[in-house]
Curated annotation (Swiss-Prot):
This is Putative carbamate hydrolase RutD. NCBIfam families: RutD. The keyword Membrane does not apply. SUPFAM superfamilies: alpha/beta-Hydrolases. Belongs to the AB hydrolase superfamily. Hydrolase RutD family. The gene is rutD.
Amino acid sequence: MNYQLFKHSDENASYVVFSSGLGGHGSFWQAQLDVFRQYFHVLIYDQEGCHASSELLADGYSFEHLALQVKQLLQQLNIVRFHFIGHALGGFIGIELAHRYASETCQLLSLTLINAWQQLDPHTLRCFTTRIALLQHAGTAAYLHAQALFLYPPLWISEHTALLEQQEAKMQSDFPPHANVLKRLNALMQYQVNTARIDTLKQLPVCLIANQDDMLVPYVQSLNLWKKLPDAQLKLLPYGGHASTVTEARQVNQLMLDFLKTSAPT
């Protein structure tokens, strides 16, 4: 399993675990590493099944598998107490980790959910089914070429075309088995933050970050989830798209750091 653990010089610093979205790669968080390493031990990891060499994921693959993977990694690294920051799918992994495995040996200090939802929005479903059709009928290159349209604002795409082309070429060379992508998408489309999980979240410091120009997940989904969590924080940004951790990294980093300071362990 691929992971990177960046240790702070202060052994007593808290841990922060970053979990990426559908792509599954820890490298998604490059724009966060330098900032967060100044204050925390930082763990990033690749979710299983996300590389060209990956084995096929099990039938019925679900968030139980995704959360168990993190739990086992944390046990391997002897990490007991930690903040968890997740982007979309990655945030749901954090919810499942808290709901299924919270114990004296697995304690979430806080949970940050970026562009999350309580249940799948019809617009998001339409985006996902479009991506599935592209993958199945047009292939990997078309799937990756369209990906930026869902992640980034139009102006940002215009200004970063060369970078996106480089990234797409790199991703195509290490694209996972199509079956794995489809199983992960299926798990994501079925996931719901039900009443039991809402009750779990009420026991945690939670911060929701959403972008009004998100072309994949309507920001009202984060708003609706926030209304179910009386003590949660909501940070609503006008710009940045679905991947605002990339497009508006400085602002999003500061929001996340400010939240972690308010939920620091005592």
